[in-house]
UniProtKB/Swiss-Prot annotation:
Assembly: Interacts with EEF2KMT.
Entry's Gene Ontology BP terms: methylation
Gene Ontology molecular function, alphabetical: methyltransferase activity
Family that this chain belongs to: Belongs to the class I-like SAM-binding methyltransferase superfamily. EEF2KMT family.
Catalytic class of the enzyme: transferase
Gene name linked to the record: FAM86C1P
Organism: Homo sapiens
Signal peptide: none
Protein name, UniProt field: Putative protein FAM86C1P
Domain of life: Eukaryota
UniProt keyword Transferase, yes or no: yes
InterPro entries: FAM86_N
A Pfam family of this chain: FAM86
Length: 165
């Protein structure tokens, strides 16, 4: 191939590379130029050059993508999951009970859990609604520690107290 034809082939190849890497639509490629170049070239050196460049790379892109897909599908997924909810819950109280508050809305494995911000209801109250808020907004207890409440539903009759620093 003459130097001028080689330079033209390189420009055509560069044009295809740029359009491909820019994710252009196939109709924007210069197909007529490629067809004309292949017809004009007696021994199809452009096509041979493309094939040689393709054969020089020993792996196909599709093979690599397939291997990554297999690795992704074979990876073991964790069975643990976390969900966050913003709830409004009502805490049932006996008239002798002296606390109420707001609970955080974090629900692990079907139970309600959150940080309690203690407040004091009216002595005559038998039920007091408490709004849930994200744990980052829950207040500190009077002793400076956060109180973690674990209950089975949104109307707790019992709670397990755990202290967090």
């Amino acid at each position: 191939m003459a130097p001028e034809e080689n330079a033209g082939s390189e420009l055509l190849l560069q044009s295809f590379k740029r359009r491909f890497l820019a994710a252009r639509a196939l109709r924007s490629f210069r197909w007529q130029s490629l067809e004309a170049k292949l017809r004009d070239s007696s021994d199809s050196e452009l096509l041979r050059d493309i094939l040689q460049k393709h054969e020089a790379v020993h792996t196909e892109p599709l093979d690599e993508l397939y291997e990554v897909l297999v690795e992704t599908l074979m990876a073991k997924e964790s069975t643990q999951g976390h969900r966050s909810y913003l709830l409004t819950c009502c805490i049932a109280q006996k008239p002798s009970c002296r606390w109420s508050g707001s609970c955080g809305g974090w629900l692990p494995a079907g139970s309600t859990s959150g940080l309690l911000n203690s407040t004091w209801p009216l002595p005559s109250a038998t039920q007091r609604c408490a709004s849930c808020s994200p744990p980052s907004y829950a207040g500190l207890g009077s002793d400076g520690k956060r109180k973690l409440i674990m209950t089975r539903n949104c109307f707790p009759t019992e709670s397990t107290w755990r202290w967090q620093s």
